[in-house]
Amino acid sequence: MHYPTEADTSTGPNPSATSAPVRPRHVTPSLSPSSSSSPSPDSFYYFLAAAVILTAALAAALLTPNPGCTIVITGHTTIIQGSCPIPPQLVLAAHPRGLSLEQYLKFTNTLPDGSQHRSHR
């Protein structure tokens, strides 16, 4: 007759059966380095929209006239309006008949609205 021994009735863990504990696996989404560096399809459209807006803003800025300096040269007169830091040589070379230094000084006294400074002589 066989009597149960302590090894047969043991409620403790069996060393051969529990050498590697088995844990339940929880599946969590993990980002691999390759998937985190590639943009999603939605981000492509955001980048495209940003590029289009930036290009449109740049084109609008470049096509807007700048009222800083206006020079009109005709056969008889030269009109300089606005704040134009122009050397006398450039004005003399630009006018077909040439200008005297006195006329250039009159141009340099021109206010941004086109009127002349009043000089006391």
From Swiss-Prot:
Pfam families membership: TGBp3 (PF02495)
GO cellular component, one term: membrane
Disordered, as annotated region: 1-40
Keyword annotations: Host endoplasmic reticulum, Host membrane, Membrane, Transmembrane, Transmembrane helix, Transport, Viral movement protein
S-S bonds: none
Family: Belongs to the Tymovirales TGBp3 protein family.
Protein name from the UniProt record: Movement protein TGBp3
